[in-house]
Amino acid sequence: MKITWFGHAAFRLDFADKAVLIDPFFTGNPSFNSTVEEAARGVTHILLTHGHSDHVGDTVSLVEDAADASRTLPVVANPEICAYLAAKGAGNAGQMMNTGGSLDCGGFTVTMVRADHSSGGPGSPSEYLGNPTGLIIRAPGEPTVWHMGDTDIYSDMALMCEIHRPKVVFIPIGDRFTMGPAVAALAVKRFLPGVEVVVPCHYGSFPILVQDASFFAQALADHPVKVVVPGPGGSFDANITPA
């Protein structure tokens, strides 16, 4: 599996014949240093953790571009976000699911799990877009990935690890809207047994967020987990033991 981070909480997973975008916030993302065309080339699915504009991002335009090319680009999201996207012109691209549920996407499975945050559209708080979530992505022969979404620490992260056995975790560290570096590091140490790789995210993109991952990485220097900080636009291969 090849993993690319585009800054903020936007990731791309490439494996087998799939190219999966998670929270594709490109336009307006100060950390984004590529082009939308390049970042989305060959994309087969979009997954959304919640409805804030810095996570829904370019979803509608990407779905419209796919439709113009006579193909459907599935968007996995909660029912409220799917209804919102349909109203914005995304048609029937939405693939509805909700917390605790799993969805077979044909070649991989997505499970929605808890995140402690909020969720609303660009007009929020007037637009309620369901509960925020994290996403567990499983594919045959690949390490299980957990994108935590935007969240604070919670003790049942340990239960999520017991149930889903993720090997790679994307964890927010930016503070103010999510947990900060110290709390995120504590979450890794206390509640993420068996995780082999953690990738910090949701930082450095806006001035009000923590600007770098150095404290987070230093706090985990003596912990048996690999901290990968790819930098915006950077990629790495997750060649680790599949779950």
UniProtKB/Swiss-Prot annotation:
Gene3D superfamilies xrefs: Ribonuclease Z/Hydroxyacylglutathione hydrolase-like
Keyword list, A-Z: Hydrolase
PANTHER family named among the record's database cross-references: UPF0173 METAL-DEPENDENT HYDROLASE MJ1163 (PTHR43546:SF3), UPF0173 METAL-DEPENDENT HYDROLASE MJ1163-RELATED (PTHR43546)
Highest taxon above the source species: Bacteria
Family: Belongs to the UPF0173 family.
Family matches, as SMART domains: Lactamase_B
Organism phylogeny: Bacteria, Pseudomonadati, Pseudomonadota, Alphaproteobacteria, Hyphomicrobiales
InterPro entries membership: Metallo-B-lactamas, RibonucZ/Hydroxyglut_hydro, UPF0173, UPF0173_UPF0282_UlaG_hydrolase
Protein name: UPF0173 metal-dependent hydrolase Xaut_3786
Any one GO MF annotation of this record: hydrolase activity
